[in-house]
């Protein structure tokens, strides 16, 4: 059996000096069949809010970055039945699960999900009317966050929206618990980046239009919607 050692301690200040993509891929591959429970209990309220304010409607070309087990992806396909919805996730098991359930629930829809690294997306410039990304940036180092944001900017059409969900840093006891979890299994938890990423998105050339905190039980999220300026 393959060795599964996901622990690689983070420095005490919580910095992620480099992205540990191989470990992240393995850990998310391993948990893919149970991950829907986590989405249901901790992410579904923020997913609702992000979708509601995303401006996504039927007939668009929509991209979801880091689909996880596909709960948001199915919502996107549902609101975009005659458009095209693409998804990607680093973990092949997550991507396969997302594709399988979307096809089963919406057999007639153009919905495609593959195992792709968000840091280098295989889409031409200006391909999408909208992109959605929930709880990914916690897992990338700063350089890779910036690189991924450049990719997001590149694949969006002028006037397109970018909806982003981050783990909130506005609940002190949660922050402490997250720092412990992140230092034990960084490939799964990463570290919180909610206070720094919005500025990086702005630096990548997108303008913020909506910014809201939401809490599901003890789990805080921040939902932001950005827009790529029209030419
Ligand atoms: C915390 S989960 C979030 C899943 C889902 N977006 C949600 O809202 O529940 C993070 C996901 O990001 C994926 N991921 C991590 N690094 C990635 C990368 N470089 N490119 C694409 N996906 C990545 C993981 O495989 C995992 O499925």
Summary of predicted features, one role per range:
Residues 63-120:
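Class I SAM-dependent methyltransferase SAM/SAH-binding core
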Residues 159-166:
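Conserved beta-strand signature within the Rossmann-like core of class I S-adenosyl-L-methionine
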Residues 146-158:
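A short glycine-rich, Lys/Arg-flanked "PGG" loop and its adjoining helix->strand segment in the class I
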Residues 41-58:
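Conserved alpha-helix/loop element of class I SAM-dependent methyltransferases that forms part
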Residues 205-206, 210-231:
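Core SAM-dependent methyltransferase catalytic element
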Residues 130-143:
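A short SAM/SAH-binding and catalytic strip from SAM-dependent methyltransferases
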Residues 189-204:
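Short alpha-helix
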Residues 119-131:
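A short acidic, Gly/Pro-enriched loop at the edge of an enzyme's catalytic core
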């Amino acid at each position: 059996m393959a060795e599964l050692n996901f622990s690689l301690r983070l420095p005490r200040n919580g910095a992620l000096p480099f992205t540990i993509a191989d470990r992240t891929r393995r850990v998310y591959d391993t948990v893919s069949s149970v991950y829907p429970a986590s989405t249901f209990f901790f992410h579904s309220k923020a997913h609702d809010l992000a979708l509601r304010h995303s401006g996504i409607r039927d007939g668009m070309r929509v991209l979801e970055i880091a689909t996880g087990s596909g709960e948001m992806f199915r919502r996107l396909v549902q609101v975009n039945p005659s458009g095209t919805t693409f998804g990607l996730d680093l973990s092949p098991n997550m991507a396969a699960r997302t594709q399988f359930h979307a096809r089963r629930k919406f057999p007639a829809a153009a919905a495609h999900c593959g195992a792709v690294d968000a840091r280098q997306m295989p889409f031409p410039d200006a391909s999408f009317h909208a992109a959605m990304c929930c709880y990914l940036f916690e897992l990338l180092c700063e350089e890779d966050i910036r690189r991924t944001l450049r990719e997001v900017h590149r694949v969006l059409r002028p006037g397109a929206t970018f909806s982003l969900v981050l783990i909130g840093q506005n609940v002190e006891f949660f922050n402490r618990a997250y720092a412990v979890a992140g230092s034990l299994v960084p490939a799964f938890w990463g570290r919180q980046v909610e206070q720094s990423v919005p500025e990086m998105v702005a630096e990548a050339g997108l303008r913020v239009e909506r910014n809201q905190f939401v809490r599901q039980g003890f789990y805080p999220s921040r939902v932001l919607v950005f827009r790529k300026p029209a030419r």
